[in-house]
Amino acid sequence: MGNCLTTQKGEPDKPADRIKLDDPPTIGVGVGVPQIPMPSHAGQPPEQIRPVPQIPESETAGANAKIFVALYDYDARTDEDLSFRKGEHLEILNDTQGDWWLARSKKTRSEGYIPSNYVAKLKSIEAEPWYFRKIKRIEAEKKLLLPENEHGAFLIRDSESRHNDYSLSVRDGDTVKHYRIRQLDEGGFFIARRTTFRTLQELVEHYSKDSDGLCVNLCKPCVQIEKPVTEGLSHRTRDQWEIDRTSLKFVRKLGSGQFGDVWEGLWNNTTPVAIKTLKSGTMDPKDFLAEAQIMKKLRHTKLIQLYAVCTVEEPIYIITELMKHGSLLEYLQAIAGKGRSLKMQTLIDMAAQIAAGMAYLESQNYIHRDLAARNVLVGDGNIVKIADFGLARLIKEDEYEARVGARFPIKWTAPEAANYSKFSIKSDVWSFGILLTELVTYGRIPYPGMTNAEVLTQVEHGYRMPQPPNCEPRLYEIMLECWHKDPMRRPTFETLQWKLEDFYTSDQSDYKEAQAY
């Protein structure tokens, strides 16, 4: 097949070759549009910033210095931050303060704080552009089959089933093949026992030159579509959940919901964010701040990152990451409005992503209470994330009670929750079943032609929506399981996640053995 990629020995300082791509009812937090490019040099922030403490060169120089390499570009958000470019070498001066580290650029000698998930230790496997850490096989397949990747694109990930082993995933035309990388007791790695390697880097170099039994030579590493989300806005705000509302700039109104508006904005004149403003009187600020302290600890790739809040005065502001394509509801309706459609495989994958986020909330004993397509947000590559988790509980009862004509989302709510206010993770499962109908009908309102009062009565008497047009029978069976009258007989989100992931996974994705040619 010829050489597509050659990893040269003796060049450990060569920057990792990552490909950078720019990154009705209630509207979900963080609804957005294409992100504003961050300026290379941040403007003067609205608050006085303490100068970064200077550490003498002698304290960190020498053999024990921690040298890391930048995996992505980063532009300073405050005067405390350090801007850097992908491939730049950084000396870590202090890594004891959580997710933001104090660093010095080896190139410019400037110092400042950096997000720790934007860098990796020099010469480590984490610094390699083909290492994707702990992602599932299904996620590897999705990434490799993106149009940005070509035949021979590959990645290495941690094995899902074998501790200390790895898996190699390779794009072969329109399919993905997987190979187990096993580790020898005495050290080293192999796919086929006839050929062993001291390091994963050597393994990649070998199979880049010669397929040696694989389906194809390894070519370019799988592209990275998204930059990671930082944990909080900056080092300065890591323990400062409440921020000054004067640090926010409202750029463009994105939409209005029942309880407030959603804006595209800037924090500190540097950082694109989504700002949700809650109408005065919607919820008690003290209750919201207490709930926000819990919400900020919920971290998962399928949950919208909550950055900060403004609760000192009303209206309350909620500041989150900005998603490029807005709410799932509007995204689906826009696709249908243009006469287009998505593959059923894509829709089911979106459902699996939502189930993964809800499985995490389930594991944390946390209830969403308002799971619907309007509260799920969409990014590039049909990546979806759950928003507004937990907020419904805080809405004042006179604003959000289960009565006909009120703002309560009757058609998404389990009967025990709508009639008796018995909310649980199992009532979220019911709502997930309704969300599945929104997916396959491109945002159609559930129970078409029925009023809220009719829905309450009919569902209580056993009525369930019929199978939507063009819906896979197996998917409709999952919907019916979600709508079981007995909450305890509804599936867990963990079960829903693997059912939907297995639904997506093709039979051709089994692990392969390297062939002896």
Swiss-Prot record:
Q: Which residues form the SH3 domain?
A: 63-124
Provide the binding site for ATP. Answer: 254-262, 276
Domain SH2, first and last residues per copy: 130-222
Where in the sequence is the active site?
Answer: 370
One GO term (biological process):
negative regulation of epidermal growth factor receptor signaling pathway
Reported consequences of knocking out the gene: Following epithelial wounding, no migration of macrophages to wound sites. RNAi-mediated knockdown in glial cells potently suppresses glial phagocytic activity with drpr not recruited to severed maxillary palp axons, blockage of glial hypertrophy, blockage of drpr up-regulation after antennal ablation and reduced clearance of severed axons in the central nervous system.
Q: Which CDD domains match?
A: PTKc_Frk_like, SH2_Src_Src42, SH3_Src_like
List GO molecular-function terms, semicolon-separated: ATP binding; non-membrane spanning protein tyrosine kinase activity; protein tyrosine kinase activity; signaling receptor binding
Bias (Basic and acidic residues) occurs at 10-23
Residue ranges constituting the Protein kinase domain according to the UniProt record: 248-504
Q: What class of enzyme is it?
A: transferase
Q: Which UniProt keywords apply?
A: ATP-binding, Developmental protein, Kinase, Nucleotide-binding, SH2 domain, SH3 domain, Transferase, Tyrosine-protein kinase
- What Enzyme Commission number does this protein have? 2.7.10.2
Annotated region described as Disordered, given as residue ranges: 1-47
Question: Where in the body, by tissue, does this protein show up?
Answer: Ubiquitous in early embryos, in stages 13-16 expression is seen in visceral mesoderm, hindgut, brain, anal pads and ventral ganglions. In larvae, expression is in CNS, wing disk, leg disk and photoreceptor precursors in the eye-antenna disks posterior to the morphogenetic furrow.
Name a Pfam family for this protein: SH3_1
Gene Ontology CC entries for this record: cytoplasm; cytosol; plasma membrane
Q: Which reaction does it catalyse?
A: L-tyrosyl-[protein] + ATP = O-phospho-L-tyrosyl-[protein] + ADP + H(+)
Protein purpose: Required directly or indirectly for the phosphorylation of drpr which is necessary for the interaction of drpr with shark and subsequent glial phagocytic activity. Together with drpr and shark, promotes the migration of macrophages to sites of wounding as part of a signaling cascade where Src42A detects production of hydrogen peroxide at wound sites which triggers phosphorylation of drpr and subsequent recruitment and activation of shark. Essential for correct eye morphogenesis (ommatidial R7 neuron formation) which requires the Ras1/MAPK signal transduction pathway.
Q: What does the sequence similarity comment in the record state about its family?
A: Belongs to the protein kinase superfamily. Tyr protein kinase family. SRC subfamily.
- Under what name is this protein listed? Tyrosine-protein kinase Src42A
What is the name of the gene encoding this protein?
Src42A
